[in-house]
Amino acid sequence: MINPWSSSDFFDYERLKKEFGISDQSDNIDHFLFRRKVILGQRGFEYIKYAIDNKIKFNVMTGLMPSGEMHLGNKSAIDQVIYFQKLGGSVSIAVADLESYSTRGIPLDKAREIAIEKYILNYIAMGLQPCEIYFQSKNKDVQFLSYILGNWTNMNELKALYGFTDSNDILHINAPLIQAADVLHTQLNNYGGPAPTVVPVGFDQDPHIRLMRDLAKRMRIFNVFYDGGITVSIKGKGDSTMPVDQAYEYLSKRFSEVTKDYEYRVVKAKDGKEEDIVRTDIDLAKIGSEFNVFSFIPPSATYQKLMKGLKGGKMSSSVPDSLISMNDDVEEAKRKIMRALTGGRDTEEEQRKLGGEPEKCPVFDLYNYEIDDDKYVNEVFEECKSGKRMCGYCKREIADKMSIFLKDIKEKREIAREKLSLYIHE
């Protein structure tokens, strides 16, 4: 079982993908985090690819937990958000102040301060364009939808997903429903209606993704799947034929071998192909939204590998010396890097003879996650493996590069402060 609130160890990613049905990531996404397999898995990403290729509306959703520092380990989610925004994605960002209160006891006013000073200013400084940033405690649509979602799940499911026990307080138990509402509310009709939605996450957040995808499927009228042709299953009572007729009318415009069955509430297009599923599902979700306000397309997700902390384990706010904060002073960041663990050998002689182990090295992770020049990063990797590159030189080099980055972000944060009203809507 994965605990999305306190995972501290690295995962066997391939085992996790196999166990929970997470698919391999697409190879044709032109971003260095995807090319290097830092983004290692996905659910439903074919919907996002379809939206990008066909220039139709899609949403990009992420959230921030206002409980500590924004650091390089969670920066890559915003790197993805900015990338998808440039491709046409409509961005929404939730400040999880209710969740931080329920799970970590952080007062709402303190959560607001942390969110703005530690996160949002950095997002803008990184290049995020104006979008919708909101606080859970202020968003009535999210609160209302989380209440409704409670009618579509039960304690047995939440216990199985999260390991909740009778001692967990209700606010904590409700936190996953609030998070699901964060993602799904962007598809309500007053936000533009059903649309493919991508959520960049770490593997530790998969329980949330599974829950919200299941909820989206349960709440829909039309569910589409492939079984040698396209089949549409329609929820409702047998005497309600209108949705069946609508699905039949839609499929008949696109396919020639279409049948409908009122008794079993099924419409089939025998000549429909598997590659037709995504478009069909999107179109029927939009049709369904005309008489079902909860006609959600199950959200897609990208899954990234955890970044190594400078002192081992994953980079986390709970170990300050193990992270590079976006708000770190340049000299402080340099100090942390120079004291970091490495994948190097015990002596310089052994390093030259045996070569280093960059795949185990927190310092190399700084190159891999932060430097977008593929050729250069590959050269660093090969020089380390061959024994040509020494750890001291590597630390000094990346420390200088991180210093330039942090100085630039610091300057842009002050400019960003003047633009906050373009992002935070209350």
UniProtKB/Swiss-Prot annotation:
It is found in: Cytoplasm. Its EC number is 6.1.1.2. GO terms for biological process: tryptophanyl-tRNA aminoacylation. This is Tryptophan--tRNA ligase. Pfam families: tRNA-synt_1b. A motif ('KMSKS' region) lies at residues 314-318. GO terms for molecular function: ATP binding; tryptophan-tRNA ligase activity. Belongs to the class-I aminoacyl-tRNA synthetase family. One of its GO terms (cellular component) is cytoplasm. Keywords: Aminoacyl-tRNA synthetase, ATP-binding, Cytoplasm, Ligase, Nucleotide-binding, Protein biosynthesis. A motif ('HIGH' region) lies at residues 66-74. It catalyses: tRNA(Trp) + L-tryptophan + ATP = L-tryptophyl-tRNA(Trp) + AMP + diphosphate + H(+). Transmembrane segments: none annotated. It is an enzyme of class 6 (ligase). Gene3D superfamilies: HUPs, Tyrosyl-Transfer RNA Synthetase.
